[in-house]
């Protein structure tokens, strides 16, 4: 059975950027870890620099595009879809993720998850408990 999830991406003011529906492996040790890995794979900057030696995201919306790209690239046909803001939490999801821009620009965003019990916490805190 599929472990479905949706990922809402919001800026630091709470404005909606994207809602990504992910049909399989939506549990924190799978999708949650992947989201953290994507967010940590580059540096958030305001304007790309020439001759850079590491991956950069030109602002938070560029990171949001990279999240969609990375999830879709590794999922094969189907499985990952863009939905409307109103669809968030209405597609039979087991987990609801939210990636929120950190108000302190240049820091990794907050990656949160709401579990089946309606509790919201940082994905990293869950992973730390599971791996302890």
Task: Name each region found by the language model.
Residues 1-27, 31:
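Short, extreme N-terminal segment that most often corresponds to the first beta-strand
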Residues 30-38:
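An exposed acidic His-Trp-rich patch
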Residues 37-132:
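Low-complexity intrinsically disordered segments
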